[in-house]
Amino acid sequence: MGNKKATLLPYRRDSASSEADFFDIPDEPCLAIAKRQLRRIRTWIFFAVFIILILWFRREAPSPAPVSHIDYNKVDWSRYAYSQYATSSAYLCNAVMVFEALERLGSRADRVLFYPEDWDLFVADDHDRDSQLLVLAKEKYKALLVPISAEMIKAGGGSGESWDKSIAKLLAFGETEYDRVIHIDSDVTVLQSMDELFFLPPAKVAMPRAYWALPDTKTLSSLLIVIEPSYREFKALMESAQPALHGQVEVDSNETQRYDMELLNNRYADSALVLPHRQYGLVTGEFRKKDHRSFFGNDYETWDPDKVLAEAKLVHFSDWPLPKPWVLSNQKLLAEILPKCDFKPGTMQERGCRDREVWKSLYEDFRRRRKVCPKIRTIHTEYG
């Protein structure tokens, strides 16, 4: 008697269905299958979009754009001023150039110009350059003209001197009708507005460091001074300056350490608010260096002359012994002073000369902008 072969799918309990019945499934139309697949795809798409929307709305909100806490339209600008002084025709033109830059950059603060009391605003003829420049400063650039006594500028030189050595900038401390005065050396190129300095935290003075002397000394540089005018401070500084005014001390002609810097450091070295020199104290001599650790304050940043210039608010012309840019220099000296290229300098294959290009552009720009002044003759000195 043979055994009956067991089926692969035995009968279910309480079920009359057989294996043949299980596979007896009617054919489903292709259209119905396609519709079912589309519904599944649509469901997954909807689910994915839903998840994306949840993640989108839960994302971290972007930081708001920085907004100045000062509404410049509501500022009483008559309480703030920039100051300049002139000890010669050359420096008078420089001062006018600074006023032109401030005007062009949209500064709304007052402008004050100290000048020798023996000058006047009467233009006698076409050769009376000083009077023409004073009128230009007053009428076009709305400068307040303040005559000063000869003793305040006798430490300075004439038009042919490249380096001004007077202490007339200290007069800005006596302008007590203003809440704050910003004094800028006139041998600069102003690149960006600096009106934000009027709203620094309270401090008698704010100055950048003479960073080129770091880390050996932490001398403050007088190329830019933010001042809270005070009769007490003015009187104290004038008393300190008496030896220089009366010829009892020799005023140094070297740009690296001037007498006004010495006076200001003696009084404010430990109390001044220090301004970042990258923005407010850059000097042209930095583009001639290969070691920029004093400028950066570290040894890991990479020097990029274009980036450095873009961050600067002003640049001070300081390339001793090269004279200032309004003085024609000897070509031999100029060749020695020019920034060196990074690769094979002095050869036909030299490359990496961007420092030189930026440095030359600063001097060329200064001379080009000097056309704002009535025809000032080019000065020749022992250098040219």
Swiss-Prot record:
CDD domains, sorted: GT8_GNT1
Please tell me whether the keyword Transmembrane is annotated for this protein: yes
Supply the alphabetized keyword list. Answer: Glycoprotein, Golgi apparatus, Membrane, Signal-anchor, Transferase, Transmembrane, Transmembrane helix, Vacuole
Residue span of motif DXD: 185-187
Which ranges sit in the Cytoplasmic compartment? 1-39
- Glycosylation (residues): 254
- The answer, when asked if Membrane is one of the entry's keywords, is yes
Supply the EC number(s): 2.4.1.-
Mark the transmembrane ranges.
Answer: 40-57
- Can you say where in the cell this protein is located? Golgi apparatus membrane; Vacuole membrane
Q: Which Gene3D superfamilies match?
A: Spore Coat Polysaccharide Biosynthesis Protein SpsA, Chain A
Cellular compartments per GO CC: Golgi membrane; vacuolar membrane
Molecular function (Gene Ontology), one example: glycosyltransferase activity
Class of enzymatic activity (EC top level): transferase
Q: Which residues lie on this side of the membrane: Lumenal?
A: 58-384
Q: How does it sit in the membrane?
A: Single-pass type II membrane protein
What is the role of this chain?
Answer: N-acetylglucosaminyltransferase involved in the Golgi-specific modification of N-linked glycans.
* Similarity comment: Belongs to the GNT1 family.
Q: What's the protein name?
A: Glucose N-acetyltransferase 1
List the source organism: Aspergillus fumigatus (strain ATCC MYA-4609 / CBS 101355 / FGSC A1100 / Af293)
